[in-house]
Amino acid sequence: MSDLLGILKQQGQSEEFDAIKIALASPELIRSWSYGEVKKPETINYRTFKPERDGLFCAKTFGPVKDYECLCGKYKRLKHRGVICEKCGVELALAKVRRERMGHIELASPVAHIWFLKSLPSRIGLLLDMTLRDIERVLYFEAFVVVDPGMTELERGQLLNDEAYLDAMEQYGDEFDARMGAEAIRDLLRQIDLEDEIRNLREELPTTNSETKIKKITKRLKLLEAFYESGNKPEWMIMDVLPVLPPDLRPLVPLDGGRFATSDLNDLYRRVINRNNRLKRLLDLNAPDIIVRNEKRMLQESVDALLDNGRRGRAITGTNKRPLKSLADMIKGKQGRFRQNLLGKRVDYSGRSVIVVGPTLKLHQCGLPKKMALELFKPFIFSKLEFRGLATTIKAAKKMVEREESVVWDILDDVIREHPILLNRAPTLHRLGIQAFEPVLIEGKAIQLHPLVCTAYNADFDGDQMAVHVPLTLEAQLEARSLMMSTNNILSPASGEPIIVPSQDVVLGLYYLTREKVNALGEGKIYSSAQEAQNFYEAGHLDIHAKIKIRMPKEDGETGYHLVETTVGRAILAEILPKGMPFDYINRTMTKKVISKVIDSCYRKFGLKETVIFADQLMYTGFKYATRSGASIGIEDMEIPDDKSSIIEHADNEVREIESQFRSGLVTNGERYNKVIDIWSRTNELVAKSMMSKIATEEVTDAKGNKVRQESFNPIFMMADSGARGSAAQIRQLAGMRGLMAAPDGSIIETPITANFREGLNVFQYFISTHGARKGLADTALKTANSGYLTRRLVDVAQDVVITEDDCGTDTGILMQPLIEGGDIVEPLHERVLGRVVASDVYIPTQTEPVVKAGTLLDEEWVEKLEKHGVDQVMVRSPITCQTRFGLCAKCYGRDLARGHLVNTGEAVGIIAAQSIGEPGTQLTMRTFHIGGAASRATAANNIQIKTKGVIRLHNIKTVTHENKNLVAVSRSGEVTIVDEFGRERERYKVPYGAVISAQDNSPVEAGQVIATWDPHTHPVISEVSGRLKFVDLIDGITMNRQTDELTGLSNIVIIDAKQRSAAGRDLRPMVKLVTDEGDDIYLAGTNVPAQYYLPVDAIVNFEDGSLVGIGDVIARIPQERSKTRDITGGLPRVADLFEARKPKDSAVMAEVSGLVNFGKETKGKRRLIINVSEDQCHEELIPKWRHISVFEGEHVERGEIIAEGALNPHDILRLLGVGALANYIVNEVQDVYRLQGVKINDKHIEVIVRQMLRKRVITFAGDSKFLVGEQVEESAMLQENDKLLAEGKQIARGTPILLGITKASLATESFISAASFQETTRVLTEAAVSGKVDELRGLKENVMVGRLIPAGTGYTYHQSRKAKRARAAAGGDSSATHTVTASDVEHALSEALNADNHEH
């Protein structure tokens, strides 16, 4: 009996483990793994196909080829299990032991492990403090190294070439020991006393001053400590014994025709064995030194190739000239072990087929072809047949199924009932790419999909395929039904808006149904109920668009009835409204946006079930009336506006005017270009406006016979207006003008396409169009790949963020304000704070009690309240400020967007964040070419026109008053706000330098008033005092050119680029200063700073030397570069740059301290800018001369203010302005890109990623901790160490947050398994092995790879209970520590989790 149990045990689960450790293997360990030495390079006997003895496939070493059968055939059958055959020496066991038994090769000479030698920084090099180059010379037998100097003057580790060695031999004889090859290196490593070295280095650190030295010592110290603490011995990096992989992991497969297909590893092993055997023979024969050396070098090279082919020298190639795949190649890359087999596996019980539309399905159903169902549910059918006694054995059942007997189909129906299946469409970019449905059996071979889930899957029916998976166990079916069912995923986890929203035909149908028509059949009649109106319509007495009145029950809890004005179509729609839903929700024209809102409110008001039923009904109705409407596209429907030709003619004249100005030298080429582009952009808008007004309305006769205009029933207009398909931009190309096009480099071609598609393009226009079209296709291919890679990096960095506790107890958060851009409120406050938890009480000026208490979760009702009270800023909890050590707390995260209540513990919010940001990335990549590259460039803003009545307030604007009484702004970061009578901010605008402000501070303004204007194409230099202009260093032909125009004789002074000046003008600094008539300097008001203005390259001076200049005059202007088109091409890389925290090229220079600015002595090519904080403290900044410095002498700057313009550097923001400002910057920048494409993502997803980028701290003060100053450590590690130190009453370590890009952050994660499977596998594993790292299996990825439930979602409770058991076992020596979890346990945990999930609904 015990034998039998033994077998079962073998088959069962391997023992449980809680962590995985990786370390260097000692030679003894390698020998203990081995089942025997591999002595011969032979593989199998090609005649008998039996493995050769002592060869690479030896049955004696690795186990039998067939189950329980020895090689010579003496013993067969299970009864001899465990016997070792005396003839062939094979132990009788299962053949699968050939997958786990290892062998070994005893090397005749030690060999260095290439990973520890060549993986930078070289570990062997660091330990010995030798350069990689030197070590390689020793290893590959080019030089001797002194191992033991004895009493000589030589030093340990000194290299000697042949001559030096011979000299030394002559001089000292046998006094010293110098050798070459790996043994020398091994002996050197052996001699290292780790404790001693560590002590010496720690003493040396404080005494050194040189940066490079400190860096080097720190690196070395870290490595030595890693070795010391992990118990690895340095000499183990040199191998005496080479392990041999089990043969079934490097198989040899016979092909037909007597040839064999083999794994490359066999070739590599054969090489090693051949060379090793030859070396042994040479050593036995006492061959000459030089031959032995060569053989040893070749052995070293062959072992290198086996471990990591191509890492050193040329890769060893096989028969067909391709490099052989070494052990390292086996595990790294997309095809490697990690990503191919551990993180992604193929699964059984699955099938795939093409999808077709299933307009009659309910939302929770999908149509499954009978053939597929029969195959997928086979085991269930077999057991049912047996259970019912229709088949005696499984074999008989199999026959019945193959014959497809009628009873089988009945049983299939039975099996399938209420058994959910999973549908997946690749690429699965977010969690809605896999959803569960109940199958409905259908004829045919295509899967039927419900149209409303297409948005989530991003599916269409042009040949897409989908995969079907069957959840087998009860738990899996339960999870599929309660969490993954399509009806449970109505809201998008990215934005919290409905994702089950009708689109395309359905929208068109509902739109058509709810439109009004003037003077339609039956207009003005009154009916007693919607039903009655419907009857009359069906009898043909009413038009569907007729305006009628219907008697309806009152809403808002009132009793009785009232008459409602509506149309017949809306009355039909009212029939499907959920009970209690106000009729005025749908008593309007239904566009896509309206429908989405209705579904959203339905979900919030009535919950899930009603919403699902309602969505389905909407869909059926939409399809029905889209068919009835008969909408189609015809050439006639593209109506070209009558005044198009005159508008274009007018634009042509304007362009001609500008061209002539350019020829007269009044404007530069850059300005001309910008102005031409602006004219054409504006013209395009005008044509579009005129076209839209023509297409959008039509003239009809009303009941009284008067002519009136109504919204038109033009099908093209209806499609765009309803949001079903197409946009105004596309209609503009069909019937307006195509407009400006972008050239391949992204610049705008200044000749627009004036034709549209209905008129047709001429050859030239067609040709310009092809640029955009082709670029679109090329971009799409490239960017899909880029976007996928971005998603992968995001998932990797955020994978272990799980909600682990309810409340971390922090009272900090981030301040939320409405997002204002160019004066428009892009995102109002109530949208931004919805679903967040308030961090501190919210007050309003008129009350002493808080409106909202801290700790409140803001739902729809609360944000309405905030809106009503006009609150314009709220401090909310954020993932960035959450204090939880591992993971996040529910309060800091807030609402689970896909469920609409506070997030549950165990929710994998990191993955969801990564998917939410990555998924639209892939959508965006597809977007560019839809408009065929039509340049979408906003006309440059040149004024501020306000939208609401109020009072104007100027904020930190420095102004001077021009002689015409207008204010001119002479500061950079100024803003104006408009406040209403309650003092609430309504609008906010940035005011650029040089803007003319036509309203005074605190003066009342009206809506529509223009309060500031400026020239968008140039940067002006404004004079702040009046006086005479004096040129300094402006020398004609050296630092400036006079560009005179032949036609007009006007001349402009233009500053020459320093790089193009002659030697004389190289160091001159052109500037203008204002002086009195006597020539004395004039100072800026209230300072001792002279009024002087440095002129940058290309500046155009407006005045001559000595002319009079008034306050606020423009002395010079600097032309701005032409603008490139903004489309998402800038978008995706921009998002990647932000998340990678890359330092932008020519980044803005920010003030390190607050103080007064003045300019110091210049150096070659740079200017010295000094900020004086106080009398004795100042900060210097060197800025290249070509940079545009945006502050003037004597100006006061705040810490973190921009001194020289450029893109902001996130690292600077973090250093100077703190975590809050950085979070704001990254969130807003990322959102800008997505907003441009009309994609909604909730801020918290970006915040979760930012949190992960800020995980590390740089140690600024080490205290009594084990850290070194300047070391980067995980915040959690620092806090844990500090807890320990506090408990012992020692000094704690302090550190400042540091920003890491997502790739760096992923690689710097605590888990080496996760990092190795992400990128740079070799480096990660080398590092982990040296320091003997332990992976606690905290994240999701690690657990997937070891084949466990992930510690998130329903698996979270499982992991928690295991943790608790471990703790109990550790405390009380509990014997049931390794208790296995039973199915009922999991089921119990699951139902608990699901109850927690459902108790809000």
UniProtKB/Swiss-Prot annotation:
Where do the annotations place Zn(2+) 1 binding? C70, C72, C85, C88
Keywords (A to Z) from UniProt: DNA-directed RNA polymerase, Magnesium, Metal-binding, Nucleotidyltransferase, Transcription, Transferase, Zinc
Judged by the first EC level, this protein's enzyme class is: transferase
One GO cellular-component annotation of the UniProt record comes to: DNA-directed RNA polymerase complex
Cofactor binding mode and count:
Binds 1 Mg(2+) ion per subunit.
Q: What processes does the entry annotate via GO biological process terms?
A: DNA-templated transcription
> Where, by residue number, does Mg(2+) bind?
D460, D462, D464
**What cofactor(s) does the depicted protein rely on?**
Mg(2+); Zn(2+)
Q: Show the HAMAP family listed in the entry.
A: RNApol_bact_RpoC
Function of the protein: DNA-dependent RNA polymerase catalyzes the transcription of DNA into RNA using the four ribonucleoside triphosphates as substrates.
| Full protein name | DNA-directed RNA polymerase subunit beta'
What organism is this sequence from?
Answer: Legionella pneumophila (strain Paris)
Primary gene name: rpoC
